[in-house]
Curated annotation (Swiss-Prot):
Record protein name field: Cytochrome c oxidase subunit 5A, mitochondrial
Keywords: Heme, Iron, Membrane, Metal-binding, Mitochondrion, Mitochondrion inner membrane, Transit peptide
Protein's job: Component of the cytochrome c oxidase, the last enzyme in the mitochondrial electron transport chain which drives oxidative phosphorylation. The respiratory chain contains 3 multisubunit complexes succinate dehydrogenase (complex II, CII), ubiquinol-cytochrome c oxidoreductase (cytochrome b-c1 complex, complex III, CIII) and cytochrome c oxidase (complex IV, CIV), that cooperate to transfer electrons derived from NADH and succinate to molecular oxygen, creating an electrochemical gradient over the inner membrane that drives transmembrane transport and the ATP synthase.
Cellular localization per UniProt: Mitochondrion inner membrane
Gene: COX5A
Organism: Drosophila melanogaster (Fruit fly)
Protein's pathway: Energy metabolism; oxidative phosphorylation
Single biological process term from Gene Ontology: positive regulation of cell cycle
GO molecular function, one term: metal ion binding
Bilayer topology term: Peripheral membrane protein
Short name of any one Pfam family annotated for the protein: COX5A
Cited InterPro entries: Cyt_c_oxidase_su5A/6, Cyt_c_oxidase_su5A/6_sf
Length: 149
């Protein structure tokens, strides 16, 4: 009991004798200039169009894009589709489409048809089916709701 009291007293004395340092607010410093939308699109198009890009790097680029607070432009989506086709990974291409569809959020009814309209020639050229063509846009084994009857 005495040792606990002594420790608490020592701690209180130490904090009162030692001056508290002034706290400086952290400042976030951004390096370089702000990137425009066109430069951003070109950077990712160039990333996906690199020679010798492998599946892991493609997945990393797609994951980075889908983690950002934006819907990728049709040019970037096409570049990602071509890259996944170059490494012969059609499943990756379909997942990329599904991720882009999911990024449309509550604007899915307007944005996703626009994206599909823009990338349909590329999809046909590469032979990549959409999620709707595969029938994976709705759950396969889902039961009808009792409230819909």
């Amino acid at each position: 009991m005495l040792s606990i009291t002594a420790r608490n007293l020592a701690s209180a004395l130490r904090s009162s004798l030692v001056g508290t340092s002034s706290r400086v607010a952290a400042v976030r410093c951004l390096h370089g200039t702000e990137e425009s939308a066109e430069e951003f699109d070109k950077r990712y198009e160039k990333y996906f169009s690199r020679e010798g890009i492998d599946g892991w790097e493609i997945r990393k680029g797609m994951n980075d894009l889908l983690g950002m607070d934006l819907v990728p432009s049709p040019k970037i989506i096409e570049a990602g589709l071509r890259a996944s086709r170059r490494v012969n990974d059609i499943a990756l291409a379909i997942r990329w489409l599904e991720g882009c569809k999911d990024k449309c959020g509550d604007q899915k009814a307007t944005l996703y048809p626009y994206l599909l309209e823009k990338i349909t020639p590329t999809l046909q050229e590469l032979g990549i089916p959409t999620i709707e063509e595969l029938g994976y846009d709705k759950p396969e084994l889902a039961l009808k709701s009792v409230y819909d009857a």
